[in-house]
């Protein structure tokens, strides 16, 4: 009798799974046929299906369809117990750019494993600046080393898209106070960081910190600096040109020698002196 009950239970589970699979397949078919609203409603109804595989497909479908209903429906699934499904919920909240979920996603950063960290990074990258500003603020305001480290790891995982938001932290602080911020920029190891930070060389409040940040970026800052110096020949902002010249010297960038030499006969003595100093740093004589 006990064996019969067990078999019945298994049969019911299989039937439920089959029903769920059939429903999600129908929803996906409707979506392919262009019946987006009907497909969305069916997918939303399957977000709490008993099968994690069905829930996973439902989350992906809701994210693909998008629209006003998608964000709130996905946000409700932030309590998902299956790790893989939850990561997909996180990614798709970013995909549909549902802003009311940003703070909840930021909360998750402090208790994330490496897989969830990547999912959160994908989401914040999709959201863009409004969400990145939130994690930059959390990183900057935290007094607890563990929490601060968690947000630091998330910022690094997000990548060069953080450059604009994090550059604002450099203002009014010493090199020592900004050491963690410089470390974030260095660890991203992407030339785009340098390109995105270039406009801040014209900001007197933060320019010297940006010069230091470029030094920390190392070889990842060389090409962007050379390109910026080339453009400066037309704009003629002497202070920005001088800073770019200094950066090439600090980086000991041999690739920049030709560009520096093109500035060696500049009308400004200040520029000529900066070129001489940078060439000395690069060549050693």
What are these model-derived regions, one by one?
Residues 23-35, 45, 53-67, 72-76, ...:
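Structural detector for internal amphipathic alpha-helices that build alpha-solenoid repeat scaffolds
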Residues 229-240:
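Acidic, Ser/Thr- and Gly/Pro-rich intrinsically disordered linkers and low-complexity segments
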């Amino acid at each position: 009798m006990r064996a019969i009950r067990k078999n019945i239970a298994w049969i019911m589970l299989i039937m439920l799974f089959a029903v769920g699979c059939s429903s999600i397949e129908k929803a996906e078919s409707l979506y392919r046929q262009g019946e987006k609203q009907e497909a969305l409603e069916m997918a939303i109804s399957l977000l709490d299906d008993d099968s994690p595989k069905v829930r996973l497909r439902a989350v992906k479908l809701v994210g693909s369809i998008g629209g006003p209903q998608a964000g709130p429906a996905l946000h409700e699934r932030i309590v998902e117990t299956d790790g893989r499904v939850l990561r997909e919920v996180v990614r798709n909240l970013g995909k549909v750019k549902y802003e009311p979920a940003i703070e909840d996603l930021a909360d998750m950063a402090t208790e994330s494993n490496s897989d969830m960290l990547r999912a959160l990074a994908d989401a914040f990258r999709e959201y863009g600046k409004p969400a990145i500003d939130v994690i930059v603020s959390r990183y900057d305001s935290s007094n607890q080393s563990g929490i601060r480290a968690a947000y630091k790891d998330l910022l690094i995982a997000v990548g060069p898209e953080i450059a604009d938001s994090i550059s604002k932290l450099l203002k009014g602080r010493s090199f020592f106070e900004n050491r963690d911020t410089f470390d974030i920029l260095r660890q991203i190891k992407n030339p785009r960081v340098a390109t995105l930070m270039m406009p801040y060389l014209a900001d007197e409040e933060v320019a010297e910190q940006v010069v230091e940040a470029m030094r920390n970026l190392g070889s990842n800052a060389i090409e962007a600096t050379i390109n910026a110096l080339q453009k400066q020949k037309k704009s003629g902002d002497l202070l920005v040109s001088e800073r770019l010249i200094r950066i090439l010297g600090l980086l000991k960038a041999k690739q920049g020698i030709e560009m520096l030499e093109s500035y060696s006969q500049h009308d400004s003595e200040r520029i000529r002196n900066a070129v001489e100093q940078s060439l000395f740093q690069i060549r050693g004589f």
